[in-house]
Amino acid sequence: MTLASPPQIKPLTDEELHKINAYWRAANYLSVGQIYLLDNPLLREPLNKEHVKPRLLGHWGTTPGLNFIYVHLNRIIKKYDQSMVYIAGPGHGGPGLVANTYLEGTYSEYYPNISQDAGGMQKLFKQFSFPGGIPSHVAPETPGSIHEGGELGYALVHAFGAAFDNPDLIVAAVVGDGEAETGALATSWHSNKFLNPASDGAVLPILHLNGYKIANPTVLARLSYEELESLFVGYGYKPYFVEGSDPALVHQQMAAILDTVIAEIHSIQREARVHGFSKRPQWPMIILRTPKGWTGPKEVDGKKTEDYWRSHQVPFGNVTGNPEHLKLLEEWLKSYKPEELFDANGKLIPELAELAPKGDRRMGDNPHANGGILLRDLVMPDFQNYAIEVPQPGRVMAEATQVTGKFLRDVMKLNLDSRNFRVFGPDETASNRINAVLDVTDRTWVAQKLPEDDHLDPSGRVMEILSETCCQGWLEGYLLTGRHGFFSCYEAFIHIIDSMFNQHAKWLKTTRHISWRRPVASLNYLLTSHVWRQDHNGFSHQDPGFIDHVVNKKSEIIRVYLPPDANTLLSVTDHCLRSRNYVNVIVAGKQPALQFLDMDAAVKHCTKGIGIWEWASNDQGSEPDVVMACAGDVPTLETLAAVDILRQHFPDLKVRVVNVVDLMTLQPKTEHPHGLNPKDFETIFTTDKPIIFAFHGYPWLIHRLTYRQPNHNNLHVRGYKEEGTTTTPFDMVVLNDLDRFHLVMDVIDRVPKLGYKAAYVKQQLQDKLIEHKHYISQHGEDMPDISDWQWPY
């Protein structure tokens, strides 16, 4: 038998075949009912237009295939007592997953009002894509779902993320042939190079070739067997083909192939667990080719519909206004013979109900799909033990991420036995200087190894692949199944997963309002190699805009932190690793930098999120003349250097220095739970004094966050304004008017009392900027009085 040939054996008895096909019919019937019906759920009376929804929404085309796979996986779960999670890549087939969780009983357990009778079925139908009801996709509201599948491309990475460190779990990942055309999905086939059969679970990819997308054929469906086989053998899989349109034949094929692949998976795992890991296995996968819109109308209004793109969404509309369409819908629904599937009360008949697994073996009730149930707190070292000694502010140098790397190393060490913490990054763990974690673990790697390879091992817990999308997807799958993780990335290139962040934030927002969904560990980003220290790589590597993107999401979900030094980064990192159901974004530098706060001060500052730095201010006992605010490590440095210049030239000027570590404190409390109420904002920023705000990112973000706060008219923000190149570190801030000299000139322009002396000081500052340009063009580095500056007070 070649890989492309289905087996000729028939593993199902006639009775088993009849029951499996009947169960599939029931799932298909419930799926069509959700799309079309408002009432008359069991067709106990002739269908009329009052029984049909006025707006028909949903996707039929992929749904019968999803239902077909589900019933066959149920058989496997029962036969092998296998723990299994179902990921529907084509998540627009939401009716199918809702139907199957209803048939197995889990849906009614989570939603008792959707009961196992005719009344419950009517509610099930009505609620789908209906105001006040449920969404059309495999959304968080769907029991058993960890993957909505609305934005395509992430089925496999979520599946592998779920399988890591879950040795008893098989994740069935259905990949739609449309989804298979996305870049994210194309790369995620390589996840098999990171799956350790000795300690991880397994992923069973099921590539569903139904041939069409919304209005076009799919690429993979038009490849020959030989090309498909070569493609997936090249990816490292052993593909098995199942295909056809005759349900009886395809049921037998699918049952036989599933028996084969499950036996292979168990054999691979048994070999690795008994004898140890020896080489990367060739994991099996299934390529299932069935008609799009299978069992639906073959034609509508004389046009081909089944096995064609016209069945993708609602195969036909205008049911209430077209008697022929109403008749067609009734015939379609009756073709499933619901009277044979449901009893007089509308409940699935017992001989079919027994096909579903029991308890938490049901895929809708598998605890891995509600990961908060399994979540255990990390064992955490005391972050204060890693403190940098700061006897005086602005004198000691340290690398913030390197210090935090030692803390993460010990987080990893303390949780090695629990196997519930991993670090993720696109080949940047060393570059971002958190590579101390490699003192206690290695990079995960099950592909070929060479003698000179460094820190590569199948049991490693640092996940590195040069794909931000894979890292993000693995981490999401890992978190949603009840574990913890940490993702470090270059700041500019985290934009690659902007849309993935969107989807995860939406998932978290929705789950907060679903009582049975338990909180999961937060998704924690460390963004470093940031805009102000990418002077060596140039303009392409300079973009602080991810935080602009993040703050668009619901305040109950997102947190943004800009720790100015190593001790504050330690405090923030500890806080984020302990948190639940958030997306935490930390932006911090990796280069040697001045340290400002000892650990006690850092903890207090991070707890408040914003505060006046008394040691840097000289307005005690009086009103300040100007507020110098800053957020971010480099803006903090430039602000303090500017304050030094102001003190030298204007010793009578009263300056208040405010540092922001929790960016969301700037919003009003009505907008974000961390926000300041207007009175507290006035206390810090005054009611009428100029505020010069040096910000890490794009200036208008500060204006957005504070526009409802008092004294906004006096707020002047400096930040990144899309000026950059390969240059020196200080020249980067000069190019964007964020340097100490421009900040002082901003004060001069906004504090009238400085009088005649201001003109001379301003001219001196302009001369310094000219001197700077000449110096770097001649020497290729910053002037010593810039690079060697320290806080002198």
UniProtKB/Swiss-Prot annotation:
UniProt key word Thylakoid: no
SUPFAM superfamilies named among the record's database cross-references: Thiamin diphosphate-binding fold (THDP-binding) (SSF52518)
GO molecular function, one term: aldehyde-lyase activity
Keyword Lyase: yes
Record-level GO BP terms: carbohydrate metabolic process
Record keywords, A-Z: Lyase, Thiamine pyrophosphate
Cofactor requirements of the protein: thiamine diphosphate
Highest rank taxon of the organism: Bacteria
EC code(s) of this entry: 4.1.2.-
Family: Belongs to the XFP family.
PANTHER family cross-referenced by the UniProt entry: PHOSPHOKETOLASE-RELATED
Protein name: Probable phosphoketolase 2
Source organism per UniProt: Nostoc sp. (strain PCC 7120 / SAG 25.82 / UTEX 2576)
